[in-house]
Structures are given as structure tokens and as C-alpha cells.
From Swiss-Prot:
Disulfide bonds join 37-201, 120-205. This is Trace amine-associated receptor 7c. In addition to the well known disulfide bond common to G-protein coupled receptor 1 family, trace amine-associated receptors (TAARs) contain an unique disulfide bond (Cys-37-Cys-201) connecting the N-terminus to the extracellular Loop 2 (ECL2), which is required for agonist-induced receptor activation. SMART domains: 7TM_GPCR_Srsx. SUPFAM superfamilies: Family A G protein-coupled receptor-like (SSF81321). Keywords: Cell membrane, Disulfide bond, G-protein coupled receptor, Glycoprotein, Membrane, Receptor, Transducer, Transmembrane, Transmembrane helix. Its main location: membrane. It comes from the Eukaryota. GO terms for molecular function: trace-amine receptor activity. It is found in: Cell membrane. It is a multi-pass membrane protein. The gene is Taar7c. Residues 69-83, 149-166, 233-274, 333-358 are cytoplasmic. Glycans are attached at residue 34.
Length: 358
């Protein structure tokens, strides 16, 4: 991130001398080109370890989220408005693993961008689009869980497939339009022309964002985050109250309708708890990054490169977390994975298999 504050003088010669210091003794991204960026000074062993760690995250994000999408879209038992939101969220995380993480892996390890200036812009746009899409999906999922837990019997009539589709469309359109309008047009660099010119070298792919847009980015994170925290606080208060009521009723003879309502409420509370953990993981992954963005925007690139890379990869790894959370808490997801990896979903009528034997 960058700043447009005049109190930070950016001199092209001083920055280049800092970044290209002792360039003759260092490896360059492009040895035969002037103004080439300097490669990261990692040893071969360190490079191998970093590639393994980052590559594992990318593979996990792609394979894990592909399993989530396949499970929900294939098995009819999982065809519900809420699960379609989860499948769309998995699609956003899958695209992070496909279009963002592999290229960021090379940039982080080598310190060089070998994929051209055009894809550098697209890479930044994809990064913003898919990550904001995940945020908006999680916000809508939290609202869905609140409705389901607060009144589980009328929930199916309130959160319909039509409403789910509108939430999905909104999440994708807003995130894509915003990210491309900001990053592909270069609006984020307004007022930072001298800084961008000073930092530009062949083999680099850096995104400079002025203070105004950094603040707007932070608000786009903060508002949904506050909504999610508020909603899940209410959900757990309702869940606690329901648990107390069920305990009281267990000492009495309950009518059949009450028993059914209790079972439904219990199922919805469990779903809310699991998705609440996914939301918490998302917020914990993203909050340090946005705080650092604000600090850098107003204090001027004080974050060390290695620390910034750590924060970015914590964000990326969040795209691989949700499938692990589902696998840990959802028996139906574990069963679906087994059916998928063993090839049993290719059998006739496999979509009607019961994933909820209980």
C-alpha cells in the first residue's frame, strides 16, 4: 500500500538506490534488462520450503472447495438456498486458489513477476474481487443463520431460492465492479504518480493505493464484519435461550410438534455454530491485513516486506480453511467426500444417496 501524503517525500533515485543496492552482487529478475527488479535473496533450500508451503495452500484451496461445490451441487439432499450460498462462497475461494495463489507464490518466493503487466493488473483485480465476494457471502450467510435459528419453522418461507440467488448475484457483481473499477482503471494510484514511477522496475507487480481508497477498502471490510459479529452474538444468545428451554421441557411431556421444533432448532444451531467458526476464521485472517494497510497508508511503507508477505498469505490461506472446518464439523460432508473420491458419485442415482442416516 502507499500514501498520497506530501509529508513522505519519494525520490526516484533514492528509492532505486535502496532497492537496487549492490545489484551487481545480487540476482536480477531479468539479467539483461535495465531497471530490473532484484530477486529475493533466498537460498535454494528456503525457496523449496516456501514453494511447498504456498503450493500446498493453493492445492488445498482448489481441491477442498471443489469438493464442497461438488457435494452441494451433486447431492439433492444438499440442494437448499443456504447451501447454494455456501457453494458460491466455495467458488470464490476456489478461484483464489486458481487465479491468485499460484502467481503470488512465484512473486513471494522469487521477488519477481514473470507473467506480464496485463496479468499483473488482472491478478490484483481477481484478488480484490474474489476476496470481497467471500466477505459478502459470509455476511449473507450470517443473516441466513440468524433467520434459521430465531424462527426455524417459518425459515424456509423467508429465505427462499430466489432470495439466495439475489444475495449471490449481489456478492459477485459488487465485488467485481468495485475491484475492476478501482484497480484496472488505475484510480487507486491517483496522486501517487511519482511514487509509482519510483517503485516501478522490470519484473515487479506492486499495487499502490492512496489514502482515500485504503479507507474505503477498510470500510468495505469493517461494515460487513460488524454486521456478522452483531448477528452471531444474537444467534448465540438465542441458542443459549433455546437450550435452556429445551432443558426445562425435557422434564415435562412435550407435544409432537414441540419435539419436531426442538429437533429443527438443534440442527440449525449446529449449522450456525459451524458457519460462525468459518466467519471467525475469516475475520481473524483479514483483520491484521487491513490494519496494516491503514498503517502503511498513513505512515508510509513502514511494514517490512517479509511481514507484509506473511499477512497476505494468511489471507490467502483462509480460502483453504472452510473445507477443513466443514470436514471437521459436518459428518455429511465427510461422507460426501468419501463418495466423491471413491468414484461412487458416478453411479446411477448417486445424487439421491442419503447423507443424513440419522
Amino acid at each position: 500500500m502507499a500514501t498520497d501524503d506530501d509529508s513522505f517525500p519519494w525520490d526516484q533515485d533514492s528509492i532505486l538506490s535502496r532497492d537496487l543496492l549492490s545489484a551487481s552482487s545480487l540476482q536480477l529478475c531479468y539479467e539483461n534488462l535495465n531497471r530490473s527488479c532484484v530477486r529475493s535473496p533466498y537460498s535454494p533450500g528456503s525457496r523449496l520450503i516456501l514453494y511447498a508451503v504456498f503450493g500446498f495452500g493453493a492445492v488445498l484451496a482448489v481441491c477442498g472447495n471443489l469438493l464442497v461445490m461438488t457435494s452441494i451441487l451433486h447431492f439433492r439432499q444438499l440442494h437448499s438456498p443456504a447451501n447454494f450460498l455456501v457453494a458460491s462462497l466455495a467458488c470464490a475461494d476456489l478461484l483464489v486458489g486458481l487465479t491468485v495463489m499460484p502467481f503470488s507464490m512465484v512473486r513471494s518466493v522469487e521477488g519477481c513477476w514473470y507473467f506480464g503487466n496485463t496479468y499483473c493488473k488482472f491478478h490484483s483485480c481477481f484478488e480484490g474481487s474474489f476476496c470481497y465476494s467471500s466477505l459478502f457471502h459470509l455476511c449473507f450467510i450470517s443473516l441466513d443463520r440468524y433467520i434459521a435459528v430465531s424462527d426455524p419453522l417459518i425459515y424456509p418461507t423467508r429465505f427462499t431460492a430466489s432470495i439466495s440467488g439475489k444475495c449471490i448475484t449481489f456478492s459477485w457483481l459488487l465485488s467485481i465492479i468495485y475491484s475492476f473499477s478501482l484497480l484496472y482503471t488505475g484510480a487507486n494510484e491517483a496522486g501517487l504518480e511519482d511514487l509509482v514511477s519510483a517503485l516501478t522496475c522490470v519484473g515487479g507487480c506492486q499495487v499502490a493505493v492512496n489514502q482515500s481508497w485504503v479507507f474505503i477498502n477498510f470500510l468495505l471490510f469493517l461494515v460487513p464484519a460488524l454486521v456478522m459479529m452483531t448477528v452471531y452474538s444474537k444467534i448465540f444468545l438465542i441458542a443459549k435461550q433455546q437450550a435452556q428451554n429445551i432443558e426445562k421441557m425435557s422434564k415435562q411431556t412435550a407435544r409432537a410438534s414441540e419435539s419436531y421444533k426442538d429437533r429443527v432448532a438443534k440442527r440449525e444451531r449446529k449449522a450456525a455454530k459451524t458457519l460462525g467458526i468459518a466467519v471467525a476464521a475469516f475475520l481473524l485472517s483479514w483483520l491484521p491485513y487491513f490494519i496494516d494497510s491503514i498503517i502503511d497508508a498513513f505512515l508510509g511503507f513502514i511494514t517490512p516486506t517479509y511481514m507484509y508477505e506473511i499477512l497476505v498469505w494468511i489471507v490467502y490461506y483462509n480460502s483453504a480453511m472452510n473445507p477443513l472446518i466443514y470436514a471437521f464439523f459436518y459428518p455429511w460432508f465427510r461422507k460426501a467426500i468419501k463418495l466423491i473420491v471413491t468414484g461412487k458419485i458416478l453411479r446411477e442415482n448417486s445424487s439421491t444417496i442419503n447423507l443424513f442416516p440419522e
